[in-house]
């Protein structure tokens, strides 16, 4: 059976950001994990989700997959149909080598994986969540770059309680149920045997502390939502779906941790005149039959302004010309890409008697020295001249 597209497996767009991919994976991994879902096909679906995430969350593998499809990642990973065993590392799922897989499964199962990583101290400083912002820009703004202001909403440290969540003059107290750990250990019987699972403390909600007198401004959250206005520099040469990171412009951290980052994802409007592929610009230029036959110098629009293009005598329809350095600026390099111009020979719909006579004489003078392509052209020209 043919493998499904990895983006379809996770239910995300091909231009999805890393955070969107991780969010989709977390949701599906929890939904289809064999210990949580005993429906037929859940395990196979779970393997498929893991395989898709393994490729798409890795920038190098994702780039190979985007360029070559399944052939670009064959033999580079996947889960190989391994079973799930238990969680003690005896043939079961292992998070080694998969980056934030362990964090994701920690969200689903706590520390149920035997020998897994210890849970983060809930009272330790934690970086805030990253945010995504989609910016739609015009085609030429993507080529030349610009500065523009954006306004978005993010959480900021509460100015009243300085992020503690407690009313001024009071402090959060250690939770007496979990003793500040934020988790409770629960023993349960499963088809795999008896396992101990750490779950979020139901008294403090995993914070490790309890706020007896909540701050009236943030209602005990430690953060408040505020609108933020930033000036964003759009890099010259940015392409549709690409993103930039603004450090420290995301959500507020916890327990004095740093702010998260803001990712600006660009959506570029198409142009009516130009088409783009990477750093190359494509456009068309109409020329007359006489210009194609005799040669000429024409003005061609580029993304940097009009330039002269020399048309050699005998130019054939749909001939491509390259204008070096007239393409898109290279973001991670110097200079510009190129522009490719395709000339379109335009046959006039109406001509006067003198023009008609001259063209008929030209056709007659050509004799049998007409290539099949030229013959095709002249047959269409005769039809035009004869009013057919």
Swiss-Prot record:
List where in the cell it is found.
Cytoplasm
- Supply the InterPro entries for this chain: DnaJ, DnaJ_C, DnaJ_domain, DnaJ_domain_CS, HSP40/DnaJ_pept-bd, HSP_DnaJ_Cys-rich_dom, HSP_DnaJ_Cys-rich_dom_sf, J_dom_sf
Cofactor binding remark: Binds 2 Zn(2+) ions per monomer.
**SUPFAM superfamilies, per the entry:** Chaperone J-domain (SSF46565), DnaJ/Hsp40 cysteine-rich domain (SSF57938), HSP40/DnaJ peptide-binding domain (SSF49493)
Provide this UniProt record's keywords sorted from A to Z.
Chaperone, Cytoplasm, DNA replication, Metal-binding, Repeat, Stress response, Zinc, Zinc-finger
Q: What PROSITE patterns does the annotation carry?
A: DNAJ_1, DNAJ_2, ZF_CR
Q: Which Gene3D superfamilies match?
A: DnaJ domain, Heat shock protein DnaJ, cysteine-rich domain, Urease metallochaperone UreE, N-terminal domain
Biological processes, Gene Ontology terms: chaperone cofactor-dependent protein refolding; DNA replication; protein refolding; response to heat
Q: Which residues cross the membrane?
A: none
Q: Which domain of life is it from?
A: Bacteria
Residues reported to bind Zn(2+) 1: 158, 161, 215, 218
- Its GO CC terms? cytoplasm
Q: What are the start-end ranges of the zinc fingers (CR-type)?
A: 145-227
Q: CXXCXGXG motif repeats at which positions? A: 158-165, 175-182, 201-208, 215-222
The J domain sits at 5-69
Query: Which residues hold Zn(2+) 2?
Result: 175, 178, 201, 204
Which co-factor is required?
Zn(2+)
Provide the GO MF annotations for this entry.
Answer: ATP binding; heat shock protein binding; unfolded protein binding; zinc ion binding
What job does this protein perform? Participates actively in the response to hyperosmotic and heat shock by preventing the aggregation of stress-denatured proteins and by disaggregating proteins, also in an autonomous, DnaK-independent fashion. Unfolded proteins bind initially to DnaJ; upon interaction with the DnaJ-bound protein, DnaK hydrolyzes its bound ATP, resulting in the formation of a stable complex. GrpE releases ADP from DnaK; ATP binding to DnaK triggers the release of the substrate protein, thus completing the reaction cycle.
Q: What free text does the record give on domains?
A: The J domain is necessary and sufficient to stimulate DnaK ATPase activity. Zinc center 1 plays an important role in the autonomous, DnaK-independent chaperone activity of DnaJ. Zinc center 2 is essential for interaction with DnaK and for DnaJ activity.
Provide the assembly information.
Homodimer.
Similarity comment:
Belongs to the DnaJ family.
Q: What is this protein called?
A: Chaperone protein DnaJ
Q: Which organism is it from?
A: Lactobacillus johnsonii (strain CNCM I-12250 / La1 / NCC 533)
Report the gene name.
dnaJ
């Amino acid at each position: 059976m043919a493998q499904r597209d990895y983006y379809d497996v996770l239910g995300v767009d091909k231009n999805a950001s890393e955070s969107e991919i991780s969010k989709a994976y977390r949701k599906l991994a929890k939904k289809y994990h064999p210990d949580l879902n005993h429906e037929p096909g859940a395990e196979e679906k779970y393997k498929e989700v893991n395989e898709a995430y393994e490729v798409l969350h890795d920038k190098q593998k994702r780039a190979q997959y985007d360029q070559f499809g399944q052939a670009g990642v064959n033999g580079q990973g996947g889960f190989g149909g391994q079973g799930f065993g238990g969680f003690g590392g005896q043939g079961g799922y292992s998070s080694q080598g998969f980056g934030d897989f362990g964090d994701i499964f920690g969200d689903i199962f706590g520390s149920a994986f035997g020998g897994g990583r210890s849970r983060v101290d809930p009272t330790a400083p934690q970086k805030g969540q990253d945010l995504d912002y989609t910016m739609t820009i015009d085609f030429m703004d993507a080529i030349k770059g610009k500065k523009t202001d954006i306004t978005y909403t993010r959480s900021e440290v509460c100015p009243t309680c300085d992020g503690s969540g407690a009313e001024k003059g009071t402090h959060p107290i250690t939770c007496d149920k979990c003793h500040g750990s934020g988790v409770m250990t629960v023993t349960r019987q499963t088809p795999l045997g008896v396992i101990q699972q750490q779950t979020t403390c139901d008294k403090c909600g995993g914070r490790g502390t309890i706020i007896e007198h909540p701050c009236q401004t943030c209602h005990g959250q430690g953060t408040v939502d505020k609108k933020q206005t930033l000036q964003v520099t759009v890099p010259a040469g940015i392409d549709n779906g690409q993103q930039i990171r603004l450090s420290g412009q995301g959500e507020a951290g916890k327990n004095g941790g740093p702010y998260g980052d803001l990712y600006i994802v660009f959506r570029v409007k198409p142009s009516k005149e130009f088409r783009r592929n990477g750093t190359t610009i494509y456009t068309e230029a109409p020329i007359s039959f006489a210009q194609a036959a005799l040669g000429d110098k024409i003005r061609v629009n580029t993304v940097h302004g009009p330039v002269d293009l020399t048309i050699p005598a005998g130019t054939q329809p749909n001939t491509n010309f390259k204008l070096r350095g007239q393409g898109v600026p290279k973001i991670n390099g110097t200079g510009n890409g190129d522009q490719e111009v395709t000339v379109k020979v335009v046959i006039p719909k109406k001509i006067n008697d003198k023009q008609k006579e001259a063209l008929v004489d030209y056709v007659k003078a050509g004799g049998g020295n007409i290539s099949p392509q030229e013959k095709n052209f002249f047959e269409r020209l005769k039809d035009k001249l004869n009013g057919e």
